[in-house]
């Protein structure tokens, strides 16, 4: 959590330290390595994902320190030499880190984060890097799908009670805001990140009173400027809305106040909201908002709108905060190159599964934008030494079907990654969550509608430069011959 005194350095898998210990005791101690984080598949078979979690990764790297009790525990495992234990005792982070800014639209196989530094240190980042980026990117991506389904209607994140632990509630709400939610019910997220919080009452409030009318009346008297009543504790149409209207008339109207709205948390939302809207309008409360909740997701929201539901705002909980339709984001962290005697040596991982064959070497991901429309045309991954000029036509091609080629012109090429750390020193200014959310909206708006479809979206092109494609295939051929 923000400003937490809890030291998360030891959120590591054991093999990270056993490998680091092995490197420490070999002639590779000073080896400089390059690692990339990337993902292979968009959640929910979608067309794109949203990058999130970088701020928390930075917090982790800023506070990397092995406490005395950590050192004693590691010593007790009898796996590490005394010299390596001493190295950890005086650990000083000294890596370079590049990352795609939070809120940016991202696609499979392109490097989201690149780490350059001593192999021992770069290895140690794997677990926390993946935990942080995978979780928040998953939730931000799910939130964005839900927000788009709502077609401009506000979506509030209401999921803290159903999250997989307090950290998931706290950071999940942050990611949901990045993805486009207008607020959260989680107070700590609101406090720490400066985002809007929202909430009114639970069914227990109504049940505590002798009758629904008294519960509503008491609440309206306490909160006349933000009166939103939960009307489905007993019967929405027969008691909830009639009692709400009565309280609006008797409590708010004499004060010159207008109700904020009503909330419905059960039943056939489409049918009930149509009836509720008419009842409120007939009573003179056409400005009274109707908020609905109840295990919503992008598909239910889309269907409700299609069926003519009269909904002004949505409160989405469990299916957002847990991304229940897709359990994991699937990001991985792989070695891409090492430096020896000033020379960069690209590395590749080969698999029988073609999707798991990595892209070797030091790389730069670029995004090409159409100058006239501002829409994203394609992403291109080049070698670290290449540049894409916006002043001349550029040929892109499908890395798997190389005969599929296209020449693009009248475009602007932008690097996706920015440098975050220089030799262990933070050089990046962390933006506020509200600014990240604004950036996210601009990013999604830069995509063609075909890419944002829920079902069978158009596959956005992530291509390799000719030089990088040749490098990859030369390594594949070289290693296959050795086999």
Where in this protein do the model-derived segments appear?
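Buried, small/hydrophobic-residue-enriched core segments of structured protein domains
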Residues: 1-34, 41-43, 79-80, 85-94, ...
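Gly/Ser/Thr/Ala-enriched C-terminal appendages of enzymes
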Residues: 2-31, 35, 45-46, 283, ...
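N-terminal, Lys/Arg-enriched amphipathic/low-complexity engagement segments
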Residues: 33-89, 98
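Short amphipathic alpha-helical segments
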Residues: 53-56, 138, 432, 436
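Short coil/turn segments at secondary-structure boundaries
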Residues: 72-73, 141-145, 159, 452-459
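Short acidic, Pro/Gly- and aromatic-enriched capping/linker segments at domain boundaries
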Residues: 97-103, 411-416
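Hydrophobic residues within beta-strands of alpha/beta enzymes
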Residues: 198, 262, 290, 312-314
